[in-house]
């Protein structure tokens, strides 16, 4: 089974988002209660605080205890200068295209840390999953922009845009899903 999550920010305390070290324990507990070692988890960036050896050891310690195969789609906080961190992932990339199933139907996905306004085959049913914006004004602007784009193309008779499905994009910030990785079905049901 595939799971998706972003913006874990392990080891990063932030009073504005009520992020403490307790936050790290909650993510770990929720993750390991849901994910098996046979599952794949796509982490769409911002795994946590890197830097000094102490920070890196903490990050390695917590990530190594998370079940499943972990694929990292890099975010703006990833330096990955420490090989110990990089080795915890089966793959590290900037952008990823995958197929997944939802309600028995195969769906193509575009994965990125950043929200993209125009992505591959967006009006042919491809879904975009992203992070970075958490719950913010930037997220509101992105959602409004995507709505405008869908409304614009809904009434167009341009070649290739007749009867095309609306573009679908979903924020997989962990705070939106009780600090737990989620399946594509859970994402689609929750939106």
What are the residue ranges of the model-derived segments?
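Short secondary-structure boundary segments
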Residues: 19-23, 70-81, 169
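Conserved beta-sheet core of the metallophosphoesterase superfamily
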Residues: 86-191
């Amino acid at each position: 089974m595939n799971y998706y999550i972003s913006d874990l920010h392990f080891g990063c305390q932030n009073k504005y988002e009520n992020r403490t070290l307790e936050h790290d324990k909650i993510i770990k507990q929720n993750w390991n209660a849901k994910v098996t070692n046979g599952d794949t988890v796509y982490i769409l960036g911002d795994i946590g605080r890197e830097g000094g050896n102490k920070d890196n050891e903490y990050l390695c310690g917590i990530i190594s205890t998370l079940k499943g195969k972990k694929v990292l789609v890099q975010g703006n906080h990833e330096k990955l200068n420490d090989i110990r961190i990089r080795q915890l992932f089966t793959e590290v990339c900037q952008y990823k295209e995958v197929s997944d199933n939802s309600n028995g139907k195969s769906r193509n996905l575009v994965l990125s840390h950043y929200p993209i306004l125009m992505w591959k085959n967006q009006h042919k049913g491809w879904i975009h999953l992203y992070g970075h914006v958490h719950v913010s004004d930037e997220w509101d602007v992105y959602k409004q922009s995507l709505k405008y784009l869908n409304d614009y193309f809904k009434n167009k008779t341009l070649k290739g845009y007749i009867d095309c499905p609306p573009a679908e994009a979903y924020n997989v910030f962990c705070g939106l899903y009780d600090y737990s990785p989620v399946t594509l079905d859970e994402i689609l049901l929750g939106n």
